[in-house]
Amino acid sequence: MISKANKNATRKKRHGRVRRTIIGTAARPRLNVFRSNKNIYVQVIDDATHATLASASSLDLEKGNTTDAASAVGKLAAERALEKGIETVVFDRGGYLYHGRIKAVAEAAREAGLKF
């Protein structure tokens, strides 16, 4: 009998492969997205110093639709990054498909002024 692959394990393997090439620096940090069933979390990370420069999550917001919350989190993360003087980032989708909540975060961050 063939066993079904665990979606999260497959995503983690995909994210590991991508992380070998995506590296955030102080000049161009990494915008990392983590999606749970209930919330979405975004961090702006400098991989050289292993420091989180800015972050936002749906826990900071009022209750709402998941896609609307994702775009609000993307906008909030972009505003916090711009306050710290970060204008360009490398987008790390965390092994997720560029669709739905991940796409909403990316588009809202771009509209708020981040370049990637």
UniProtKB/Swiss-Prot annotation:
InterPro entries documented for this protein: Ribosomal_uL18_bac-type, Ribosomal_uL18_bac/euk
Q: Does the keyword Transmembrane helix apply?
A: no
Biological process (GO) annotations held by this record are: translation
- Write out the entry's keywords from A to Z: Ribonucleoprotein, Ribosomal protein, RNA-binding, rRNA-binding
For this record, the Gene Ontology CC terms, alphabetical, are: cytosolic large ribosomal subunit
One GO term in the molecular function aspect is: structural constituent of ribosome
Its annotated function is as follows: This is one of the proteins that bind and probably mediate the attachment of the 5S RNA into the large ribosomal subunit, where it forms part of the central protuberance.
* Family to which the UniProt record says this protein belongs: Belongs to the universal ribosomal protein uL18 family.
Q: What is this protein called?
A: Large ribosomal subunit protein uL18
